[in-house]
Amino acid sequence: MPSGKTHDTITVLLAVPTAAAAFAVTGDFWLSLVVFCGFIFGGLMFGPDLDTGSSQYGRWSIFRFFWFPYRNFFKHRSRWSHGLIFGTVLRVIYFMGVVTCVAFIVAYVYTAYVGGNLPGVSDFARVWAQVRTYSDRLLGEYGLAGLFVGMWLGAASHTLTDIAGTYVKTGKAGL
């Protein structure tokens, strides 16, 4: 299995060619920049090794607690953490859920302290809709899709590097 430093180097080396490919496909500089940023984030912070005490996990610093349940629930190198199809999708859904839960807890503590009404599920849905509207305004119509594609490619480069490393060591193409 390649080291964290090897994964980081591969992420950095592939980021510019990924952005160039995104520009060749879309012809949109800003969308290519979003893909580039997603690739860097996906490779360095949001990759498959968040289920271990990896450098990706360590980079979350004081926010590592977000990933504690994920680390305990998913087996390392499983199809759910390292899978090309499910890995990034699952991490995005998990992260959005954790952020929503943390926001709910903060809102609950705040309303308990100062009084008022606790926000309901519809309030959180409205906030996520506003996040989508804001991101469309900031990143463009395809910005979130470009961000996800970049994150997926960054995480996929990690998984494919693991597969290649396993093949070199054992002669078997598997995780």
Question: What is each of the regions a protein language model found here?
Answer:
Residues 1-175:
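N-terminal membrane-targeting hydrophobic helices
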